[in-house]
């Protein structure tokens, strides 16, 4: 590992030791964050897969009923029955924080247009029970479908944050900290060499002075 290009002084040694302490502490905090993010991410992925499976199954069942309804009803009557929306939906998207990751939190409100609370956008005279079943199932899918969108977006954002954190952890672990350790070791070695050199010079001066005194 290449060391940093710095002057081998005691002041620089003190500064680098402080940087190493900060980097080591930061590495531990980021590693802990990475581990916790991974734990939550795995739980979220499992829940996402289960939720997606449920939603796909519900949609498949609803489509089966639509196919049956289409077989029993004319295309014109079917299209006319589902042409006009029965309810209005308003969606509020807020943000919640999970381990420094801002993920969406979705809430929606449903408002049926007529007073009797019926979810069916048609009368019952010319339509089939299969169409009723399809509409009812689609109506019940919406909350889960919205939750699925929320969970999948949260999963994506957490995956991005895990990757960012992993890069920072690796940069500290494999580059910054080893460079600091190598540079500190180099400065300590240079300072020890300087001390030994200074001590040798002092010993030589002392010897010379002693010889001068003996010759007097």
Swiss-Prot record:
Keywords: ATP synthesis, Hydrogen ion transport, Ion transport, Transport
NCBIfam families per UniProt: PRK00373.1-2 (NF001543), V_ATPase_subD (TIGR00309)
Superkingdom: Bacteria
Cystine crosslinks: none
Keyword Membrane: no
GO molecular function annotations of the record: ATP binding; proton-transporting ATP synthase activity, rotational mechanism; proton-transporting ATPase activity, rotational mechanism
Function: Produces ATP from ADP in the presence of a proton gradient across the membrane.
Family according to the record: Belongs to the V-ATPase D subunit family.
Pfam families documented for this protein: ATP-synt_D (PF01813)
GO annotation, biological process: proton motive force-driven plasma membrane ATP synthesis
Database matches in InterPro entries: V_ATPase_D
Protein name in UniProt: V-type ATP synthase subunit D
Gene: atpD
Keyword Nucleotide-binding attributed: no
């Amino acid at each position: 590992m290449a060391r940093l290009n710095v002057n081998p002084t005691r002041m620089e040694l003190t500064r680098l030791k402080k940087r190493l302490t900060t980097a080591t502490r930061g590495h531990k905090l980021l590693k802990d964050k990475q581990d916790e993010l991974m734990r939550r991410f795995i739980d979220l992925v499992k829940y996402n897969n289960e939720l997606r499976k449920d939603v796909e199954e519900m949609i498949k069942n609803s489509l089966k009923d639509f196919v049956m309804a289409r077989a029993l009803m004319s295309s014109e009557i079917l299209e006319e029955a589902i042409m006009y929306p029965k309810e209005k939906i308003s969606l509020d998207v807020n943000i919640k924080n999970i381990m420094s990751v801002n993920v969406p939190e979705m809430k929606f409100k449903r408002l049926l247009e007529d007073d009797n609370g019926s979810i069916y956008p048609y009368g019952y005279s010319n339509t089939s029970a299969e169409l009723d079943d399809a509409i009812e199932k689609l109506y019940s899918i919406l909350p889960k479908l919205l939750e699925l969108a929320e969970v999948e977006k949260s999963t994506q954002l957490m995956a991005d944050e895990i990757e960012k954190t992993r890069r920072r952890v690796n940069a500290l672990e494999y580059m910054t900290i080893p460079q600091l350790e190598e540079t500190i070791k180099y400065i300590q070695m240079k300072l020890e060499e300087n001390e030994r050199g200074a001590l040798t010079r002092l010993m030589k001066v002392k010897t010379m002075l002693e010889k001068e005194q003996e010759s007097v």
